[in-house]
Every structure is written in C-alpha cells, then in structure tokens.
Amino acid sequence: MEYDLTQKTLPFLDRHLIYPLLQFLKGRGVYNDTELLQLEYDLLKDTNMTDYLVELSKELGQNDADLQAKKENVVKTLAELEEATKPVFEVLENPEVVSELKENKTQNQALLTSKYGLSVEQINLLYKFGQFQYNAGRYQAASDILYHFRALSTDPELVASATWGRFACEILTSQWDSVLEELGKLRDSVDSRSLDPQQQLHQRMWVIHWSLFPFFQNDTKGKDALCDLFFSSSYISTIQAACPWILRYLVVAVIAGGHPHTASVFQKRLKDLVRVVGQEEYEYQDPLTRFVKSLYIDYSFEDAQNQLADCEKVLKQDFFLADSADAFLESARKLMSQVYCRVHQRVDIAQLSQTLNLSQEQGEKWIANLIKDSRMDAKIDESDSTVILNHPSVSVYQQVIEKTKGLTFRSSQVLNQGVTI
C-alpha cells in the first residue's frame, strides 16, 4: 500500500512491540501473509518464546530441531534465575525491610548489604531475571521484577534500560495509566541525562514511536497527551528534523481529539498543526496532511473532499489509527463545513451535502447541528434550501497579532533546532 508506514516505524520499535503490528497486517492485503509469517518467525527466533516459535515453525512447514534444545535451556535458566534471586525477594517481602528503606538509593544499598547481606551483584540479577522473563513473553512478571530492580539499583544505565523495559511491558499488557506514568519517567530520563545531541535525538525518536501505543489506545486522554508531547518544543523539532511521517498521527490526534471545535485548546492546536504541515509539505505528505493543507492553506474544498476519501483507506490500514477512523472522519467533515460556511455568505445545502458526501436530508440535519454546536450567526432559508451567514469582520489589529504569533512560533522552532538538534 502506497501510504503504509510499517517500514518507517519498525526500526524504532522493540521486537516485542513489532509483533502486534504484524498480527494486524495479516489478511489485509498490504503484505503477503506467508512473508509476514516468516518475518514474525525471524523476529522472535532469538527470544525465549520457544512454545510459540514451535507453532510458527509448523505453520511455515519447517522443522527447527534446535527449538527443543532451546526450550530445555530456557526452562533450566529460568529455574536458575528464580533460585538465584530468591534471597532478594525474601528480603523485599519482609515488612521490616520495607519500613527501613529511604528515598536515597545509595543508603538503601548500604543497608541491604550490611544488614541483610545483599550484594550489588544479587540486585543486578533482578535486572537479568526481568529481562529473561520479558524475552519469554511473560510481560507482567517482567514488569514486577523490573519495578523492584529499579527501586533498588544505583546504576543509571541499567535503571534507564529497566524503565524502557517496564514501558514495553505495560504496553503489551494494556496497562494504559501505568504506561503514561512510565512515559513521564522516560521523558525525564531522556531530557535530563548527559547525552550528546545526536543520542538525545535518537532517544526522542524512540519515545515518539513507542508512545503511539498508549496515545491511540487510551481514547481522548491519550490523544491529549500525544498533542502535549508532540507539540512541545524539543519533540516537534525532532519530528520535523528526523521523522516527519509522525505528522500523520498528530493530524489525527488534533482532529479526532474529542474537543469541541470552538474550544480554545482545539483552535490553538489546529493553528500549530496547519503551520507545521505547511512547513513540512516538501518533506512528507499523505492524504491526512494534504487534507489539512487543502482545507486551511489552499482553501480547496474539492481537493479536501478527495483527500478525505483517501484518508479513510489510510486510517483503516494503520495499526495505530484504525480505531480512530470514524471519529476522525466525523470531525473532519465538521471542519470542512465550518470552513465552507466561513468563506461563503450564502450556502446551498444541496451543494454542501454533495461536498460532504451526504444525502440532502443528512445535509440538512448536519448543517442544523453545525449551526447549533459552533454557535454560528446563521439562519436557514427553507424556501430555497440555503443558509444565510453573518460574518463579523476581523480588525486589522487582530490580523497583525495573529501574523506575529505565527512568526514567533516559527522563530522559536528554528532556534530550537539549532540548539537542540
């Protein structure tokens, strides 16, 4: 499919996060199903998910003799790690120990070593155990183990890695509130750690791609969080500089975000979105970004209508956006209606209905609801099925303010790209 972003997003996802995307693509005609099955096998063959690998091997008509030996080794290693970490869990499950632990990890580690005989190496075994469980597809167990490890460890690199691991575990077990908490920790880690600019750019790209999971599985709350993150100075700069295809998801988050179109938060996000889409049109385009450009930059209703028809196909073939397709299309039609009414003083309901791919009766209900919801100064003339609109004039002073806002935003983006990236 022309606008499929799978090959753009895969390099920025962990193999376990890629698995649900491959499952989604099966049977959709975008890729050959046998090739997808082989890709799934190749993707997971280095993990500890041996039972599932045996099933995939059979489906592919292969007989991987090494899998049985690998399975036995996984079971053996799991038992060894359980035994090796038992003393750590026994200490952590002691209420007396919990009451003695403080916020200072260095002090805690000294206490655990001197009073309870736990070494740094034993604590680090929790990380290894959590990682092993994760690679076996036991995400809830891995999440719990990594939580305990992170609470005790003073190793910044391992703590950062454990945070990424917990983030993935919570995504894969659909613990969306916890996912957003982990995302906050990751942002703090990426923004505060002493990384060189190139490393920081790459880390932010991973945060952006991983965050698509909770943002589009968490209804309005998720889309709000996406807008807050992606429109922040450092992240919008990253998107524009390194992964402009993410604009597709920003378009959906803004337009299908659930806010009334008259709300100030929606209007601000929409203005910022239009500005960024216009800036990046030579770097990235798809039907969703072109819909925004057609409607708000070119004011071409015919082109916007054509792009909206293509948007539906793109949305329903995108793992992250399929569930938001109906909400996006509904909201996009409302936006088309509002802009159409804004540039006309008299609107023919039949013509507007045709533009929106609605019947005459649907169009009449649509425009009546639009006038009510958007508080337009308008009235319907039933004698000739038209809508008469009264547009208040915008002062030159207000127009200058709006232009200045746009220049200020762009200047800040240019400065941020120069400093941050």
UniProtKB/Swiss-Prot annotation:
GO terms for molecular function: translation initiation factor activity. Keywords: Cytoplasm, Initiation factor, Protein biosynthesis. CDD domains: eIF3E. One of its GO terms (cellular component) is eukaryotic 43S preinitiation complex. PROSITE patterns: PCI. Signal peptide: none annotated. Component of the eukaryotic translation initiation factor 3 (eIF-3) complex, which is involved in protein synthesis of a specialized repertoire of mRNAs and, together with other initiation factors, stimulates binding of mRNA and methionyl-tRNAi to the 40S ribosome. The eIF-3 complex specifically targets and initiates translation of a subset of mRNAs involved in cell proliferation. This is Eukaryotic translation initiation factor 3 subunit E. It comes from Yarrowia lipolytica (strain CLIB 122 / E 150). The lineage of its organism: Eukaryota, Fungi, Dikarya, Ascomycota, Saccharomycotina.
